[in-house]
Amino acid sequence: IRDRGKSISYRLVYTGRKDDTSLDASLFSDLDMKAPDVYLGVESSNPTSLTAGIMVAFEQELTENPAHVVLVVDDLTATMSCAIVAKKQGIKVAHLVAGTRSFDMKMPKEVNRMITDGLSDYLFTAGMVANRNLNQTGTESENVYYVGNILIDTIRYNRNRLLKPIWFSVLGLQEGNYLLLTLNRRVLLNNKENLPVSYTHL
């Protein structure tokens, strides 16, 4: 859209707090994005309380700022909560990164994915496997759009804009001589036996 010289009027909603410690102060400018128009300020370590809090706050947001479409991203509790609220208000839902599956219903994110995809009017996928997953659950093909991997797209778009973080020089890191990874899966972090095995394989 940007490359075609067009724009869409939208509001960016962040369900957490403005002073969220997981948000770097320069995150949005680094990614060439506008800062959120509103921070709902919802936080809770309890998934049920978090879901309820986001739903109440987002309902108020949509009441004050009606929308034609609500675009939700990924597979978070916020993704599912906002999709439910939008659908209950008769607003179309678009899901970016739809069709992702682990086929493990013990994972909270898998529940989020299933519910969000089931409610969505437009499903934007990262790959053909995701398309197949949606088709196998009865999603109409005309509602599924393969748009590619937005993470890779974001890296490609920003890679020449961003400076190396200062910790590159502080730690003496050299290109090709380090490995950066994230470990955020409960199955890894909650099992003392799994974590050492992961490090060994790395």
Give the label of every model feature segment.
Residues 200-202:
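Conserved small/polar residues in nucleotide/adenosyl-binding loops
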Residues 9-50:
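Conserved nucleotide-sugar phosphate-binding/catalytic loop shared by glycosyltransferases and other
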Residues 13-15, 96, 182:
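Short hydrophobic segments within beta-strands
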Residues 1, 27, 39-140:
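Active-site and donor-binding regions of nucleotide-sugar-utilizing enzymes
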Residues 107-111, 193-198:
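Charged helix-capping and loop-helix junction motifs
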Residues 9-11, 94, 122, 145:
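A structural signal for isolated positions on well-ordered beta-strands in alpha/beta enzyme cores
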Residues 17-22, 41, 119-194:
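A nucleotide-sugar donor-handling region in carbohydrate enzymes
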Residues 1-8:
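A short, Lys/Arg-enriched amphipathic alpha-helix followed by its capping loop at the start of a domain
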